[in-house]
C-alpha cells in the first residue's frame, strides 16, 4: 500500500527520462474509459536509488525468494487517484468495517509505459439521500479526538496531521452486496515512539507510526477500526 510514509521514503518529484504529465494522463485515460470520477492524483517518484535504499536484500518472501534486484530501468511513477462523488473523495485508507473497505486506484508507469493498474473496491452510485443532520465542524472533531485520548495513559505524543472530509463505505446488505457511502472525517494521526535499546548506556531509538481515526461527520461517533460500524 502507498501511505503517507511513502512520501517520506520517496521524496523526489521527478524521474529522469519519464514524462510525469504523460504518465498521469495514461492512467487517467483508463479511468475515463471505465467511467470512474477521480480527484487530482498524488504522484510518487520511485527512483532507482530510493528503491535500492528501501529494500532489505537480507529478507526473503514466504517462498524463500530473494527481493528483486533493482536497476535504473525499474524507476517508475506510482500514480494514486481518489474516487469522488460530486467532488467529495471516497476514502482510500486501509480501514475495515465488516467486509467494506476503502477505494484504491493506483497506476504504475515506467520508461516502457504502463506497468500495473489496480482499481479496487470501486463503488457505483445507485441512489442519493439527503443528509439527516448537518456536518460537524473540524473543531468538534478535534474535541472528540482529545476526549478519545483523555482517559488513555500514553507516554508518546499523538499528533493529528490531516483531517479530511471523505465518503466512507459502510456495509448495508450482505446478501445484495449493498453499501452506504457516509460522510466521515478521516483523521491521520502520527505517534513517535521511543524504544529502549539493550545497550549499557540505556539509549533510545525512535520509531514512527501513522494510523487513521475515523468519525461520522454527522453524529461524531467513531468507527472502530477492524470492527463493524
Question: How should these model regions be labeled?
Answer:
Residues 26-37, 144, 148-152, 187:
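Structured segments of extracytoplasmic/periplasmic soluble domains
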Residues 1, 90-119, 197-229:
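A short, surface-exposed beta-strand/turn
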Residues 178-182, 192-196:
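Accessory, solvent-exposed terminal regions and/or long lumenal/extracellular loops of proteins
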Residues 82-88, 166, 188-194:
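Generic short beta-strand segments
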Residues 97-181:
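Charged, low-complexity helical/coil segments in non-catalytic cytosolic or luminal regions
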Residues 74-78, 100-102, 180-184, 208:
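A general secondary-structure signal for short beta-strands and their flanking turns/coil
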Residues 1-96:
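Preferential activation on post-signal-peptide N-terminal prodomains/segments
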Residues 27, 107, 185-191, 220:
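Conserved histidines in hydrophobic membrane contexts and catalytic metal-binding motifs
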Amino acid at each position: 500500500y502507498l501511505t503517507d510514509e511513502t512520501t517520506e521514503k520517496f521524496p523526489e518529484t521527478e524521474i529522469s527520462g519519464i514524462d510525469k504529465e504523460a504518465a498521469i494522463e495514461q492512467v487517467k485515460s483508463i479511468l475515463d474509459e471505465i467511467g470512474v470520477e477521480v480527484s487530482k492524483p498524488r504522484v510518487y517518484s520511485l527512483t532507482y536509488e530510493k528503491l535500492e535504499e528501501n529494500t532489505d536484500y537480507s529478507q526473503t518472501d514466504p517462498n524463500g525468494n530473494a527481493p528483486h534486484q533493482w536497476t535504473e530501468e525499474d524507476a517508475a511513477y506510482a500514480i494514486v487517484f481518489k474516487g469522488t462523488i460530486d467532488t467529495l473523495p471516497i476514502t482510500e485508507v486501509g480501514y475495515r468495517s465488516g467486509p467494506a473497505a476503502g477505494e484504491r486506484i493506483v497506476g504504475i508507469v515506467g520508461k516502457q509505459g504502463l506497468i500495473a493498474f489496480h482499481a479496487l473496491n470501486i463503488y457505483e452510485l445507485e441512489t442519493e439521500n439527503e443528509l439527516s443532520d448537518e456536518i460537524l465542524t473540524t473543531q468538534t472533531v478535534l474535541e472528540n479526538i482529545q476526549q478519545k485520548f483523555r482517559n488513555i495513559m500514553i507516554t508518546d505524543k499523538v499528533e493529528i496531521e490531516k483531517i479530511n472530509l471523505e465518503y466512507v463505505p459502510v456495509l448495508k446488505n450482505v446478501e445484495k452486496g449493498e453499501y452506504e457511502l457516509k460522510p466521515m472525517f478521516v483523521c491521520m494521526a502520527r505517534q513517535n515512539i521511543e524504544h529502549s535499546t539493550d545497550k549499557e548506556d540505556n539509549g533510545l531509538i525512535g520509531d514512527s507510526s501513522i494510523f487513521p481515526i475515523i468519525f461520522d461527520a454527522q453524529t461524531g461517533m467513531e468507527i472502530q477500526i477492524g470492527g463493524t460500524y
